[in-house]
Amino acid sequence: MSKRTCYAGDVTAEYVDQEVTLKGWVQKRRSLGSLIFIDLRDREGIVQLVFSEEFDKDALAVANSVRSEYVIEVQGVVKKRKPQAVNKDMKTGDVEVEVHTITILNKAKTPPFYIEDGVAVTEETKLKYRYLDLRRPEMQKNIFTRAHIMRSVHHFLDDNGFIDVETPTLTASTPEGARDYLVPSRVYPGSFYALPQSPQLFKQLLMGAGFDRYYQIARCFRDEDLRGDRQPEFTQIDLETSFLTAEEIQDITEGLIAKVMHDVKGIDVKLPFDRITWQDAMDKYGSDKPDLRFDMQIQDVSELVKDSDFKVFAGAVQNGGQVRAIVLPGGADKYSRKMIDAQQDYIKRFGAKGLAWLKVTSDGISGPIAKFFGDGADLVKAVGANAGDLVLFVADKAKVVADALGYLRTHFGHDLGLIDEQAFRFCWVVDWPLFEYDEGIQRWVPAHHPFTMPNEEDVHLLDTDPHAAHAQSYDIVLNGYELGGGSIRIHNREIQEKMLKALGFTPERAQKSFGFLLNALDYGFPPHGGLAIGLDRFVMLLTGRDNIRDVIAFPKNSKASEPMTSAPYPVADAQLKDLGIEVRADVDPEKEHEGDENLTE
């Protein structure tokens, strides 16, 4: 093979009249009588090749035999295209290569789908032939963007005194929330390693060891149910620092984000990011990860309706609940009763019993509950509505109201075109509760993880009323997605033991699960804190994708399997025998894990 002159996608006017050697894949071939045109593709783009008897008869014959996805090498001379043949949509659209030599480096079967963007093909097929799917320009762009982000992260953190330290992939299983992926030990029959759900404890130990500033592009593993922005194995930008306050850690993180946004997107984000308390986020936006690209804040009308004749509202307030509302600008004419009722059915999944609504008219109000509120002037004024608006109400317990209206706010924000899809709005959500109640397992669990330091003024509550305590924790949010989360950590053994006790750990169980950390805290740990940013999600948002599978080279599908390699699959009996493992077919995985502690961040 000859040495390549440049990438096919980089052949521009500067190469005119020069001899070039190019290599790549055949995107398509077109035969026009005595001429053959081939689009040659590589990672940088496509350039048009021209074959003719005038240039070389043998090359023309070979070109006539190639098919899509053949791998070829060509030599030829770059020429300007005729004005009528210029393609302004291509970087190389001003030129073409008149080829005199072509070599077929490899042939290809007909692919199961066209290698181009926008092709209709099932997700399963794309994953089965991932090496073909990754040839598509948009997929290559996603992976290159990911690499660009990682390079920017490394540069910023290296320049700011952080040291890149690898932590173990084979470690001990600890109750951190999601199920662990377990790795059996051949040397210690009946014992297992766990793949890390995060480097959390190791990075804290590194602070105890005096490294002061740690970072890692860390691979993490969680055996949990999947969705569009989750994978069983994922990557996070992991940071930890000593002797810094939460505000100082947030400042460093903002600097990191600002550099990435500048380097990768050419955007100078506004600093500092907005800060909103957890309670305000829930009250105003119905979410602990609010999308601030549009307003539509939730309004509390509990006081106004607590004595109304509409018993649904009055009863909710009397029973300790709330009545809150959102205003859909111009929604009165846009949404029919049938369309509103469809959302009423949807929000029942949040526990809401129904959805009340009013349309604001020039004469007052109309709708199913209008008769209970006269002309509705006070209600309309309270929520800030105008003629032509639609007002939606939910009455229930605070969490149900927040979850339901938070969903409705996002849904209608998109539907009404209120969201600038090109915008990037970052914010911090701070002052979190230390604990939250998990309705599913009927138990108090950490809002983040059990190593989070309470606010200084709330430390005493660990002895008396731990569920009233707030935490020194903070989440960074981008466009309605949790981009990352962090906290100041507990660096005092006594406080850590109280935290575990509040979670129901006996001293014996605490020592068994976290003894190595508790023992380490006896040896002079500095105050420390950190943060982890989900790299996959960050790349997804910066590339405008809606599924993280599109920004991971070899992801799993929604069932946590990989169609390309057929993983996971049964292994040989001999391998199981070496590990002392017997496979049972009668195990219900859900039942086996009933009662597991949820200690997730």
From Swiss-Prot:
Q: List the disulfide bonds.
A: none
Report the EC number(s), separated by commas if there are several.
6.1.1.12
Which keywords does this Swiss-Prot/TrEMBL entry list? Aminoacyl-tRNA synthetase, ATP-binding, Cytoplasm, Ligase, Nucleotide-binding, Protein biosynthesis
- Give the GO terms filed under biological process for this record: aspartyl-tRNA aminoacylation
> Where the protein is mainly located, per its record?
cytoplasm
Where is the protein found, in the record's own terms? Cytoplasm
Q: GO cellular component terms?
A: cytoplasm
Quote the InterPro entries the UniProt record gives: Aa-tRNA-synt_II, aa-tRNA-synth_II, aa-tRNA-synth_II/BPL/LPL, Asp-tRNA-ligase_1, Asp-tRNA-ligase_1_N, Asp/Asn-tRNA-synth_IIb, AspRS_core, GAD-like_sf
Q: Which residues bind ATP?
A: 222-224, 231, 482, 534-537
Catalysed reactions, semicolon-separated: tRNA(Asp) + L-aspartate + ATP = L-aspartyl-tRNA(Asp) + AMP + diphosphate
Q: Where is the stretch described as Aspartate?
A: 200-203
The residues that hold L-aspartate are 176, 222, 448, 489
- Stored PANTHER family: ASPARTATE--TRNA LIGASE, MITOCHONDRIAL, ASPARTYL/LYSYL-TRNA SYNTHETASE
Its annotated function is as follows:
Catalyzes the attachment of L-aspartate to tRNA(Asp) in a two-step reaction: L-aspartate is first activated by ATP to form Asp-AMP and then transferred to the acceptor end of tRNA(Asp).
Annotated family? Belongs to the class-II aminoacyl-tRNA synthetase family. Type 1 subfamily.
The subunit structure is: Homodimer.
The name this protein goes by in its record: Aspartate--tRNA ligase
